[in-house]
């Protein structure tokens, strides 16, 4: 990710619904949390809401960086448990790196996010890490709902997306400040 997150030139595309201010997604968060809770998929919505509220950090003030924007298990390739590639660069755009920095919460095993952030350069500041957790909550809720739709045969559903999203949410809640 360090190699990708470089300043984008003027005129680079911006994300359709990612990479901008996290606060712009408050309504989306509330709707997704309500839907997932109503379906019985979220055992402690208040804990999830607390993670989201903690992510209300100052907006990114640095230059717009190149972002993948869609880092989740279906877009990461592995071989024998080792990352070996990333696919689906169709959303490549410029914005706040916190959007991509949500990926360790979604992709890595328990306890690995801090190691990832320790190796990422330049080292992300506290506000960026808080926003990354907010992006991870959004991604987890979306994937939980897509997974549930798949389990129940609804259009657009992908049953394999739910389990890793539940793990992501559990990690975020367990590590909340």
Task: List each model region and its residues.
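Helix-rich C-terminal or lid/interface subdomains of diverse kinases
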Residues: 103-177
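N-terminal alpha-helical segment
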Residues: 28-29, 97, 137-140
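Surface-exposed alpha-helical segments enriched in charged/polar residues
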Residues: 2, 6, 34, 53, ...
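Central P-loop NTPase core of STAND/AAA+ ATPases
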Residues: 40-51, 55-56
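Generic structural signal for secondary-structure transition and capping sites
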Residues: 6-10, 57-60, 149, 177
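Active-site Asp-x-Gly
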Residues: 64-65, 72-133
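Short glycine/proline- and charge-enriched loop/turn segments
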Residues: 31-33, 84, 100, 150-153
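A cross-family kinase active-site recognition segment
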Residues: 1-45, 61-64, 92-94
């Amino acid at each position: 990710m360090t190699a990708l997150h470089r300043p984008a030139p003027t005129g680079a595309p911006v994300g359709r619904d990612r990479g901008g201010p996290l606060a712009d997604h408050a309504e989306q968060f509330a709707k997704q949390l309500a839907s997932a809770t109503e379906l019985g998929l979220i055992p402690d919505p208040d804990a999830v809401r607390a993670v989201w509220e903690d992510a209300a950090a100052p907006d990114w003030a640095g230059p717009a960086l190149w972002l993948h924007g869609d880092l989740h298990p279906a877009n990461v390739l592995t071989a024998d448990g080792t990352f070996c590639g990333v696919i689906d660069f169709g959303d490549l755009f410029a914005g706040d790196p916190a959007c991509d920095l949500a990926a360790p919460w979604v992709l890595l095993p328990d306890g690995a996010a801090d190691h990832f952030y320790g190796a990422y350069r330049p080292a992300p500041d506290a506000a960026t890490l808080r926003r990354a957790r907010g992006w991870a909550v959004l991604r987890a809720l979306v994937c939980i709902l897509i997974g549930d739709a798949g389990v129940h045969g609804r259009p657009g559903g992908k049953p394999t997306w739910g389990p890793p999203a539940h793990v992501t949410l559990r990690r975020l809640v367990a590590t909340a400040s």
